[in-house]
């Protein structure tokens, strides 16, 4: 007959295995997202709401910051969640949130890459200001659009890869500690 301790350890090992599988599945999904950043994903709807809220949040800081605030807030919000989990000592949850951060950066890179051609549909229609066209024009960096978009995409991809490794390592580490 198994003791209560043996049963609990078995459940903990199962939980760790589930965590590894979840990290792997998230990794496959988000690595696919990194390879296809132009595709729309469900999480992009969340990112869009956060992006638009960022314009309102940064509005008191002037026009440039209000416009930059959309993309900034879209990246800051997942960072806040990641920081919260890290502060609480939950590295695995932090790793999962880093997948979101990486995908959000990919989303921002697509918007930045569109700053010259301006073909993405904007919420306000044709009369809307294209955030990245406005920002890069004001910073005299429109000629650097491709480089800037690539750098943001690379950072997003690296964040996703880091999240994958960190999530698996933390799940595996907790599995070893439970045996």
Stretches with model-predicted labels:
Residues 47-59, 70:
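Active-site recognition of the HExxH zinc-binding catalytic motif
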Residues 4-36, 63-179:
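Metalloprotease/metallohydrolase-associated module, dominated by Zn2+-dependent proteases
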Residues 43-48, 66:
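Active-site alpha-helix of zinc metalloproteases
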